[in-house]
């Protein structure tokens, strides 16, 4: 697998400003080195405040590292032209934890999915409509759902809409920032199985940002563990995961002993697909 997106010794600090002045800089990410390759699924695992979301924002180009570099297919983001940034925005997309907060509640589903098609592709009106309908079907919804408002959909359905929106420009990498954490166990399983199906169809890579080792074991091939802003461990995902670092083992002890499993899972309310294991 060829490298797709890399971080090399990336560090990030923040200061807070109050009425009494600026606070000392707090380092939230320290010399993180990560390589994401075509077609693989990598977990970024850590407790709250470990630096996971900061590293994800740097990889997405939403923030700049204080030190180190982020590169897409070997080209540092800091040297991108406007055209290269536009191509990068289409190639690397994100799905957020809060699906309702990630969409405009006044926009219908068709418009939500249509925004990246309008800004990141060269399709005409007819082409965008056809692509929108195909995306809805691809995530287990129907073209009729394009006329619905977000509040008319279940949580699982709306997360499918967010995935369809992220797929719209044909990305090579999806960053999933706690993207299934707000769903119940059965919906988590359905969403993971949907993402696996989409990966088989498209060959895209995933960066799965999470604190839940059970989902990592079900979904990912490789896991990177962060603690206090540092990468403390990196390992392939195995059926019986054995960690070395104390922070990794603490995460392992925190999960329930049973792994999620289902023989046959029905879809979320109003959904059209079922996941069968």
Curated annotation (Swiss-Prot):
The keyword DNA-binding does not apply. The gene is nikE. Residues 14-253 form the ABC transporter domain. It catalyses: Ni(2+)(out) + ATP + H2O = Ni(2+)(in) + ADP + phosphate + H(+). The complex is composed of two ATP-binding proteins (NikD and NikE), two transmembrane proteins (NikB and NikC) and a solute-binding protein (NikA). GO terms for cellular component: plasma membrane. This is Nickel import ATP-binding protein NikE. Its EC number is 7.2.2.11. Pfam families: ABC_tran (PF00005). InterPro entries: AAA+_ATPase (IPR003593), ABC_transp_ATP-bind (IPR050319), ABC_transporter-like_ATP-bd (IPR003439), ABC_transporter-like_CS (IPR017871), Nickel_NikE (IPR014137), P-loop_NTPase (IPR027417). NCBIfam families: nickel_nikE, PRK10419.1. The keyword Nucleotide-binding applies. Belongs to the ABC transporter superfamily. Nickel importer (TC 3.A.1.5.3) family. Keywords: ATP-binding, Cell inner membrane, Cell membrane, Ion transport, Membrane, Nickel, Nickel transport, Nucleotide-binding, Translocase, Transport. Part of the ABC transporter complex NikABCDE involved in nickel import. Responsible for energy coupling to the transport system. It is a peripheral membrane protein. Its main location: membrane. Disulfide bonds: none annotated.
